Regions:
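Hydrophobic alpha-helical transmembrane segments
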Residues: 67-80, 149-155
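Alpha-helical transmembrane segments
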Residues: 33, 84-85
Length: 179
């Protein structure tokens, strides 16, 4: 049975990680993110999509194990958004407002200039090929430019990069993850 002290400590830990002032704005951020992707897809799905591949894209091989990096980015983004939201109320709101404005720009771009690319065929049946197929099944080859993946990675880093209260190793780690 949990004691009052352990429940209180759990609540204090939760409030440090996810302060009350950040909960609704962070929830709105998640809803907005999906709305931008799915809303743009619903509006521009039948529009002509522009293939933005270059000859460089044709020269870069698909290396299936790199799918781990893609899925690992979600962990980085969650940590990055929680970290930035927990810094203080003003920082949280500025950080999330930057996200919301940037996502509005992305939405406009996705509707005005829909983009796509040609994905290579995934061959094989090992775990890496299966993970790539799973990725392709859940992440359509549209809404590519501008890249929300790059956007949120960079936001996570720039949200903390100049803050001397954030340990240098965390700032460096965020920078490496963003790149």
């Amino acid at each position: 049975m949990l004691s009052r002290d352990s429940i209180s400590q759990t609540g204090q830990f939760f409030n440090r990680i996810l302060p009350k002032y950040s909960r609704i704005p962070l929830l709105f951020t998640v809803v907005l993110n999906f709305s931008v992707y799915w809303g743009a897809r619903a509006i521009a799905g039948s529009f002509i999509h522009h293939n933005i591949e270059t000859s460089l894209d044709d020269m870069i091989p698909v290396v299936y194990p790199t799918v781990v990096i893609y899925f690992g980015c979600y962990i980085f983004w969650i940590i990055g958004y929680l970290y930035n939201a927990a810094m203080d109320k003003r920082h949280c709101y500025r950080f999330l407002m930057a996200d919301w404005l940037a996502k509005a720009v992305c939405f406009i771009c996705y509707v005005v200039y829909p983009t796509t690319n040609t994905r290579p065929e995934i061959v094989g049946s090992d775990i890496w090929a299966q993970l790539m197929r799973f990725l392709y099944s859940m992440d359509a080859a549209d809404n590519l430019f501008p890249s929300i993946h790059c956007l949120v990675s960079w936001l996570c880093y720039i949200g903390i990069r100049g803050n001397k209260k954030v340990p240098q190793w965390i700032r460096t780690t965020f920078c490496i993850c963003a790149i």
